[in-house]
């Protein structure tokens, strides 16, 4: 075992000597010269390597520090005396205002009575607050149940986006850096359609509101609109997965990266040519979405613009400029002609196309890092997530400041808000997925125990309101998508 060197031992002895000397010093009323003499004697009694000039300077500094403390101490005493004087004056004035000549005993009784009332009031408030705390702990007995239902494995690279169709039959769509988009049977986990029309990473996938048509955005600087025809296979029994509370956080070792190398999409039908390609961007197209009605589509690009297209003619209708850096996401309102775009410039913008003759824009400035996504809720809210590790809820009628802020421990990626319960699903860089309500109250964390959950960054979440077994999907850079069954008791959602 290594021993201490001579210089280190000497330094420790010197430190111990100083400590013992300093503990033995008592405060006195001696003059400044006496104090300096005492300190000089102390330093001279030690084996000091300091030159005399340096020691004298230190002594002067110590003297100044002590004088400052003395002044503070005297000021404190003077302030206390003034406070006592003011309290006495207030007591006399209060007695004069009351107009009653109270004896000393009566004043004591009155003071004790008021003190008793104050004490009783504090006890009542304390009981009420603690009862609320206890009741909130009791509600955790009805915990959110988050059950892993199905893994969707078949991509050869990380997944950027996940989406669920809005038409029947309900299928799952994934967009991957392996240049493909896959459609899956939610029940069986089997690949139904493979789209290979892009020459770059597929960054997002969204489905037409009424037809079997998909919209994908890609790193090849285009967005493709393509048709699919699916027939669901016969459902098979789901794997028996034990229900795990969403608040558990038991980590597990990473699985072998080769687990996801099996190409489940090799034997599924392939679509190679789109119905139309949208080609007006000069950079990566990072996201795309359908406007309400499905007759127009919007794209977001790293060229700092968002484009609005006519789907039937593929013509560019509007080019939305104003962001100072690359765009990261775009989203459309489910019932109105509104678009929100997110950017690395720490802002997101709301574009209003409800008036055909003019479109307005509002800029939201509330984050300190890249805004990774901003999405609409059913009501008049927008929820934004950022690399600054926060999620903010905004009211479209009052856009100056957020109405709720959620602070987390990791960067937030593409969030999703459920239509029915208005629950926000937060995918994180640290492999976690957390659930919050629209008021910012944490509801659950998806389990990562028993070798379940994501092993790499979670890029996106998507809710499915209509499916009976899986109502939340997540995807990440572990090359898989996961289907979850989330049961949030109504008790947890009470405000």
Curated annotation (Swiss-Prot):
Compartments (UniProt record): Cytoplasm; Nucleus
Recorded GO CC terms: cytoplasm; nucleus
Polar residues bias spans: 22-31
SUPFAM superfamilies the UniProt entry points to: WD40 repeat-like
InterPro entries from the UniProt entry: G-protein_beta_WD-40_rep, WD40/YVTN_repeat-like_dom_sf, WD40_repeat_CS, WD40_repeat_dom_sf, WD40_rpt
Biased composition (Acidic residues): 246-264
Chief location: cytoplasm
Sequence ranges of the WD repeats: 154-194, 197-236, 280-319, 322-361, 366-404, 407-446, 453-494
Disordered as annotated region, ranges: 1-34, 237-268
Entry keywords, A to Z: Cytoplasm, Nucleus, Repeat, WD repeat
Keyword Chloroplast attached: no
Protein name: WD repeat-containing protein 37
Organism: Xenopus laevis (African clawed frog)
Annotated gene: wdr37
């Amino acid at each position: 075992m290594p021993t201490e060197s001579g210089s280190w031992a000497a330094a420790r002895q010197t430190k111990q000597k100083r400590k013992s000397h300093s503990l033995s010093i008592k405060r006195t009323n001696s003059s400044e010269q006496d104090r300096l003499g005492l300190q000089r004697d102390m330093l001279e009694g030690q084996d000091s390597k300091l030159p005399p000039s340096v020691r004298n300077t230190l002594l002067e500094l110590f003297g100044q520090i002590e004088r400052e403390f003395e002044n503070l101490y005297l000021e404190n005493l003077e302030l206390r005396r003034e406070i006592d004087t003011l309290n006495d004056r207030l007591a006399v004035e209060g007695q004069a205002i009351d107009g009653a000549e109270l004896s000393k005993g009566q004043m004591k009784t009155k003071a004790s009575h008021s003190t008793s009332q104050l004490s009783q009031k504090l006890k009542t408030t304390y009981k009420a607050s603690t009862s609320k705390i206890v009741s909130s702990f009791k509600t955790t007995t009805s915990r959110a149940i988050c059950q892993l239902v199905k893994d969707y494995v078949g991509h050869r690279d990380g997944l950027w986006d996940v989406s669920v169709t809005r038409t029947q039959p309900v299928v799952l769509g994934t967009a991957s850096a392996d240049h493909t988009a896959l459609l899956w049977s939610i029940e069986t986990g089997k690949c139904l359609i493979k789209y290979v029309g892009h020459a770059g990473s597929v960054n997002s996938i969204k489905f037409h509101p009424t037809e079997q048509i998909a919209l994908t955005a890609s790193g090849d600087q285009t967005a493709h609109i393509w048709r699919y025809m699916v027939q669901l296979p016969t459902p098979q029994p789901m794997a028996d997965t034990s229900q795990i509370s969403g608040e558990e956080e038991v980590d597990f070792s990473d699985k072998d990266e080769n687990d996801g190398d099996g190409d489940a999409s090799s034997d599924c039908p392939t679509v190679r040519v789109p119905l139309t390609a949208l080609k007006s961007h000069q950079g990566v197209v990072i996201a795309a979405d359908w406007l309400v009605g499905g007759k127009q589509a919007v794209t977001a690009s790293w060229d700092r613009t968002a484009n609005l297209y006519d789907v039937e003619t593929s013509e560019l209708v509007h080019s939305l400029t104003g962001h100072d850096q690359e765009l990261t996401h775009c989203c459309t309102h489910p019932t109105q002609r509104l678009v929100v775009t997110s950017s690395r410039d720490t802002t997101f913008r709301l574009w209003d196309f409800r008036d055909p003759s003019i479109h307005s824009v509002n800029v939201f400035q509330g984050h300190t890092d890249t805004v990774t996504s901003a999405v609409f809720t059913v009501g008049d809210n927008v929820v934004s997530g950022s690399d600054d590790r926060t999620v903010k809820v905004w009211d479209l009628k009052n856009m100056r400041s957020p109405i709720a802020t959620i602070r987390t421990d990791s960067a937030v990626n593409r969030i999703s808000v459920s239509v029915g319960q208005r629950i926000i699903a937060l995918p994180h860089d640290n492999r976690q997925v957390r659930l919050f309500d629209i008021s910012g109250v944490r509801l659950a964390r998806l389990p990562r125990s028993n070798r379940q959950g994501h092993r790499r960054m979670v890029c996106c979440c998507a809710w499915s309101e209509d499916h009976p077994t899986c109502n939340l999907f997540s995807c990440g850079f572990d090359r898989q998508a996961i289907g979850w069954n989330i049961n949030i008791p109504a008790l947890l959602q009470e405000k």
